[in-house]
Amino acid sequence: MLIIPAIDLKDGHCVRLKQGLMEDATVFSEDPGAMARHWVDQGGKRLHLVDLNGAFAGKPVNEGAIKAIVKAVGNDIPIQLGGGIRDLDTIERYLDDGISYVIVGTAAVKSPGFLHEACYAFPGQIMVGLDAKDGKVAVDGWSKLTGHDVIDLAKKFEDYGVEAVVYTDIGRDGMLTGVNIEATVALAQALTIPVIASGGVTNLDDVRRLAEVESEGIIGAITGRAIYEGTLNFTEAQALADELSQI
């Protein structure tokens, strides 16, 4: 199971939000490229980037910072990116820039046809980001709750050729309250496509609990605030996940 460091970008800086609230941002670094390189040097096998401004604006905003990260990382590890991706031109531009996987969130919920087109145009490189609160999907940078049940919606996307589902529990994101194992496992069990867990991964116990259910289809866990504030040592977390994967 991959432990995936998150780099959330706001106004060109690396930040973390609590429950997706832009006004509750903590700046962790003003040099996104250096931060990305740090996680590679610590043994990271993949990076998770989010253009937070883009998620709210509905178009790319932090492209400069994203290019700096790609340049710093080079071809060392894959990078997945979400936030503000609403058209095929944006996807193509990011992939040309060196991003490995593009995460379609709001646009997948509002325009399933667009998601289908994206999967057809860029096979193996499109993920779906489903962000949920109490089992209901949120859109537009988490600012609006829909009536869609997260499992029902994810199952509709299975035949599209989606590479993975990035599932975020909004209520736990950035709160250091522990991962929602039950909801994550329920989603993974309902799908044939892999799930990457996000939101609330706080300590080694969370990593252990997720790694123990990896066989249900959970291929990774994204962590942000915990590795920046020190409640989780990234290198230890990946080592534990690797160890449990071999049992």
Curated annotation (Swiss-Prot):
Transmembrane segments: none annotated. GO terms for biological process: L-histidine biosynthetic process; L-tryptophan biosynthetic process. The keyword Ligase does not apply. The keyword Isomerase applies. Pfam families: His_biosynth. Its EC number is 5.3.1.16. It is found in: Cytoplasm. HAMAP family: HisA (MF_01014). This is 1-(5-phosphoribosyl)-5-[(5-phosphoribosylamino)methylideneamino] imidazole-4-carboxamide isomerase. It comes from Methylobacillus flagellatus (strain ATCC 51484 / DSM 6875 / VKM B-1610 / KT). The gene is hisA.
